[in-house]
Amino acid sequence: LINMSHPEGSPLAFFPPTYYLDLRFSKEDWNQGKTMTLEACAAGHAFLDLYDYTGEQMYYDRALGIADTYLRLQREDGSYPIKIDFKTGEPVNEVGAMLHPLLNYILRLHNQYGITKYDIITEKGEKWMDEIAVETFNMTGQFEDVNVMGLEPYENLTNCTAAPYASYLLNKETVSEKDLNNAIDLIRLSED
């Protein structure tokens, strides 16, 4: 994983590829040379788990390197593109990623390790989720087996984004009335 990830100083520093080798979805034209933006969160969690277990600093440093790249990639409005070019880091379209994986990753860095440097990701990300994704109920699926090129709003709805964000909202240290109401609406959307 480390050897396949982007080196420090590159546009996607420390990000591993979503698509590699000769696997089924790696062969799809729409995935070649691309990566799902939020897939690096899973690698970040894995590096933190390895650090917790082994105490080896390099794993902790890689996890923070991934968070640093997310800090740099966040758009002014708090959003992230769903998929990006793996070499340049440029978005392949304007479809926004649903941010629950990233928000949970940043929450872990804050709660378990006391790191506050990335809290701005949470602040801006929650604002975007609430004002755009939740407000419009455009909870776009984040599946690599779907071509996101030309994806229209509401074309790829799924409970796999609505339900996890509802869970994130309900598991916050302080759940506001707005968080609760949004979570209830998202759960209802998931049931439909």
Label for each model-derived stretch:
Residues 1-192:
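Glycan-recognition and catalytic cores of secretory/periplasmic carbohydrate-active enzymes
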